[in-house]
Amino acid sequence: MAETDPKTMQDITLVVETLLQQMQDKFQIMSDQIIGRIDDMSSRIDDLEKNIADLMTQAGVEELDAENKIPTAQKS
């Protein structure tokens, strides 16, 4: 087996380290983007829940909902 030149080993090491750093940077960027999108979705869901609750209040559904919470066994 031929010995590898120390200069060549240093070059390979540098290339691998650079590649790993680039990959880590890209994964960090993607992770930040995903977390940002999840936060946006969470805010949108909160807004939707609030709007639905407001619409239900306007329609008087909350009053009907309280009546429907009686277990079916007790309704008869």
From Swiss-Prot:
Biological processes, Gene Ontology terms: axonal transport of mitochondrion; cellular heat acclimation; endodermal cell differentiation; muscle contraction
Top-level taxonomy: Eukaryota, Metazoa, Chordata, Craniata, Vertebrata
Location in or out of the cell: Nucleus
Coiled coil regions in record: none
Taxonomic superkingdom: Eukaryota
Assembly description: Homohexamer. Associates with heptad repeats of HSF1 trimers and probably also HSF1 monomers, and with HSP70. Association with HSF1 trimers and HSP70 coincides with attenuation of heat shock response and the conversion of HSF1 trimer to monomer.
A Gene Ontology term for the protein's cellular component: nucleus
Keyword annotations of the record: Nucleus
GO molecular function terms attached to this record: identical protein binding; transcription corepressor activity
Job of this protein: Negative regulator of the heat shock response. Negatively affects HSF1 DNA-binding activity. May have a role in the suppression of the activation of the stress response during the aging process.
Official protein name in the record: Heat shock factor-binding protein 1
Family assignment from sequence similarity: Belongs to the HSBP1 family.
Listed InterPro entries: HS1-bd
Gene3D superfamilies: 1.20.5.430
